[in-house]
A protein has these predicted regions:
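N-terminal Rossmann NAD(P)H-binding glycine-rich loop of SDR-like oxidoreductase domains
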Residues: 11-12, 19
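Rossmann-fold scaffold of SDR-type NAD(P)-dependent oxidoreductases
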Residues: 8, 77-85, 130, 172
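Active-site helix of classical SDR
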Residues: 115, 149
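Active-site-adjacent segment of SDR/Rossmann-fold oxidoreductases
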Residues: 138, 159-170
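Residue(s) in the substrate-gating loop at a strand-loop-helix junction
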Residues: 133
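C-terminal helical subdomain
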Residues: 173, 188-225
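Conserved mid-core segment of classical short-chain dehydrogenase/reductases
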Residues: 63, 71, 85-101, 142
């Protein structure tokens, strides 16, 4: 029987290439996604066996439906990979509590609840890998709600790593910068941008090599280090 992994956020290009990387290790996939047709197309384009994929077309906001599916799983899971997220618009979220709440649900509350609910079904020696963001390393006005949600997620993963250590479950924190997905529309130096395929390969390798925290792009690690050295009384005057 093949080991099974769950990928949440299966419609993304990162997930497409994660399918390719983990498929080589003979896994079966349980995929949660917003667009089932897109996931099916990913599988076809990569020429993968569709019988190794179970696809659930669910909204990020509908966590209760996710729980029902988890309750029906009658086998252990080897790994969980959380790729989903949404940046949002802080100017709109400051004026609309519902939008702000949705940002926190999508980027913090839902991944925490989903992972926590799955832990009893996770095999000892398994893994949890979560894509966070450099936006979670220091608060910025242009990423106000998204960044604070990702900061909470990074802290949760640190605590979870301690909590699951005795079970031999490996917790992997992924910290990307800019990734050239379909929605990417930021003008930036090419050195700051990573392709979805390279991102997926780095995630795969970090799980294989049990790297607990990885930056997808080394330049972002340097930038984050420098930003964290700036005193708050100076940092507050910046606009980025």
């Amino acid at each position: 029987m093949r080991d099974k992994i769950i990928i949440y956020g299966g419609s993304s290009l990162i997930s497409k290439y994660l399918f390719f990387e983990f498929y080589k290790d003979d896994y079966e996939f349980i995929v949660f996604c917003r667009d089932k047709k897109k996931v099916t197309l990913h599988i076809e384009n990569l020429k993968l066996d569709p019988s190794r994929f179970t696809i659930h077309n669910l909204s990020l906001e509908d966590i209760d439906e996710n729980f029902k599916i988890i309750d029906n799983l009658n086998y252990k899971i080897k790994g969980i990979i959380w790729v989903a997220g949404a940046v949002g618009n802080p100017n709109e979220e400051m004026l609309n509590a519902e939008l702000a709440k949705n940002n926190y649900y999508i980027n913090l509350i839902n991944p925490v609840l989903f992972i926590d609910y799955l832990i009893p079904k996770l095999s000892d020696g398994g893994f949890i890998s979560v894509v966070t963001s450099v936006a979670g390393l220091r608060g910025r006005a242009k990423k106000l709600f998204y960044g604070s949600a990702k900061a909470g997620l990074i802290n949760y993963l640190s605590g979870l790593r301690q909590f699951l250590h005795k079970r031999g479950i490996f917790v992997n924190t992924i910290i990307p910068g800019y990734i050239s997905t379909e929605r990417f529309n930021i003008k930036a130096s090419k050195f700051l941008i990573t392709s979805p395929s390279k991102t997926a390969k780095m995630i795969y390798q970090s799980i294989k090599n049990k790297k607990e925290i990885i930056y997808i792009n080394f330049f972002w690690r340097i930038i984050s280090f420098i930003l964290n050295l700036i005193p708050e009384k100076i940092f507050k005057k910046f606009n980025f």
